[in-house]
Amino acid sequence: MAKSVWTSDKIVAQLDSGAHWSGGNLTYSFPTNANWVAYGEKAGFSALNSAQQAAATSAIGMWDSLIAPKFTLTASDTADIKFANTTTSIGYAHAYFPGQSPTAGSVWLNPNYGANSGTNNLVDPQVGQWGYQAYVHEIGHALGLEHPGNYNGGSPTYQKHALFQQDSQQYTVMSYFTADKTGADWIASDGKRYYAQTPMLYDILTIQSIYGEDTETRDGNTTYGYNSTAGDAVFDFTQNLHPVICIYDSYGIDTLDLSGSSYACVINLDPGSFSNSDMMTSNISIAFGTWIEDAIGTAQNDILRGNAIDNVLSGLNGNDILIGGGGSDTLYGGEGNDTLDGGTGADTLLGGAGNDLYTVDDAGDVIIEGANGGSDTVQTALATYTLANNVENLTYIGTGSFIGYGSAQDNVLKGGASHDQLFGGNGNDTLLGGNGNDLLDGGSGTDILQGGLGNDTYVVDNASDTILESAKAGTDTVQTNLATFTLANNIENLVYIGTGSFDGIGNALVNTLTGGDQNDTLKGLAGNDILYGGGGDDVLDGGAGTDKMFGGAGDDTYVVDNARDIVTEGVNAGTDTILTTLRSYTLGAEVENLTFVGTGAIKANGNALDNVITGGAGNDTLSGYGGNDHLIGGDGKDILIGGAGADTLTGGAGADVFRFSALNDSNTLSYDTITDFNAAELDKIDLSQLDANAGARGNQAFSFIGAASFTGVAGQLSFSNGFLSADVNGDGASDFGVWILNVTSLTAAQFWL
């Protein structure tokens, strides 16, 4: 069953025995006789040797640096804390709490634990050994600290006797249980196990709650570790090669420097936190309330973590991870592929040489990268971000929409799951939109754009740009200022955003192609496409499929190859032309001209406008309907029907028929003109649908009188001076007429009357 984690206040209450020294400063001594001893230790008394006194003095110094009272060495056997050896009434070592009796505050050591005891040596204890830790432990008792559990001597076990999770020497030197019980590993690079060399986290917190803090301890700018200025060998890692310490510091801009170590480190500058060095874990801690500002790692792959104030973290060489925490931090990655995260606050991040990864979470963060300093990446959750010079890549790690701008380098920009806008700038960039409806603009350079899922928009300004889209990944649009562009596979729409003329080509999907204000050519290819010409004289070709084409302003040309194609033109929007291969076609509203470009024959119908209808090489039937139309038959045996209005009829080669269906198709208000009547080609003028005598029942045929004048008989048809006229009511005046150019005479055989 897992043990509970106690709060700091609860642990302090557990460690505080309630017995304290009072009256200001404290004294300690090394008595040379046992006259003051009232208990069983007296019989086996002996004074400490010089090595023991040095160890005791060192350990006293550790405690002295923590609390407001100052320790003074005295020769008196009435000192507050007295150190002595005994071989009686003792196991390994023990001490008495503060009090009024002569024995109160005394620390007793068993000299039988000497050189043969290895790390348990109490006769010549070395810093880092169990024996030295025992000195620190017993002084804690002499100052009023209790064990963290209900045990005293014997052989208690962590599982059975520890009351809370933090009961180990990792947290308090007053514990009986080694640091590995709570996950620390104090086996160092030399393969040996080391022990606490100072009071630990909760020792410091408790002793300062009793006696107050020493506000003069290392109150300047202090460096701990290598290049130490702490003034104590235990904090100088050129002397203390295998540190197991807790750092207390009162003031100043302080540094934890592990630069001299050959082994990777983990540094955490948070008060109450642990750091790893010399192949150990959780062997360096920082006291609660102590603020260390700066950290220096090793040449290996380190992890450095700041705290809530302004930190300077230096990773040196190696692939380091630097995390600033709160405050306005400065992070130096050094050589290697480093990860730099300033945390909250306006931070300055310098990755150095190598492929570095920056996490930017504050708009005030500044990244400084040198030229040729590797391929570097920024990841950010900010809503908008612009890459600094010499930083190549940008990845959005937030949850909302994102606007990202590249730099002059070759960038890789990655969006997130929402609607992002990525702008590559200069360089040959790769833009990855991810999910969402993204806008990707590679800028100048040869770019690769991949929108991912969603309805994406690509801005293409280089003919070498590449767009990658998967099938069924949304409805996507290309915006381009190039003079010509063809949609890649799986992209639906194309919009021209330039200022000149444009040639745009679709693909096999359902495309929407939009031109600009100049003379554009849009080709839809397969699919049911929509084409918008915009301003200018445009050519719109929907290709296969049922297409919709909107020419806009200008004289537009439409290519129609499907009977279901729809052409939409506005009023007074230019003179527009249909090119079609269909066998039958009728002009829609506001479209003026129709040209057959197929291989067979066409039945072509105009509308109420002035149309130009042009047939092909087959036997075409062209009908102008309303308006002053021009019908051009081309090759073949064509039938031309001008309809209402003053029409111009050009049959072209072949035996053509010029058909008139109503008197008002060509009367005194709007005479039609036949431009190329050729009797040798067997052309005919078809008047068979006209009633030659309005006064008689039925449809009467005309009587051709050659070049003679009308004689007042209804139904006479005359041709003179290039004008064909008919009198249908016998009044001697022309009721119907047609101009026939370049013809001097006609015969009845050239009519269908």
Task: Give the residues covered by each predicted segment.
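Zinc-dependent metalloendopeptidases
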Residues: 1-299
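GD-rich hexapeptide-repeat beta-solenoids
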Residues: 25-36, 159-167, 172, 177-186, ...
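Secondary-structure transition/turn motif
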Residues: 30-33, 85-88, 111-114, 260-262, ...
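Acidic glycine/aspartate-rich repeat arrays in secreted/surface proteins
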Residues: 77-85, 146-171, 177, 183, ...
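Active-site-proximal structural scaffolding
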Residues: 132, 167, 200, 240, ...
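Short, surface-exposed beta-strand/loop micro-motifs that present aromatic residues
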Residues: 161-164, 244-247, 349, 449, ...
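Short beta-strand elements of solenoid repeat domains
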Residues: 257, 294-296, 303-305, 312-317, ...
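Residues in Ca2+-coordinating acidic/glycine-rich loops
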Residues: 297, 306, 730-732
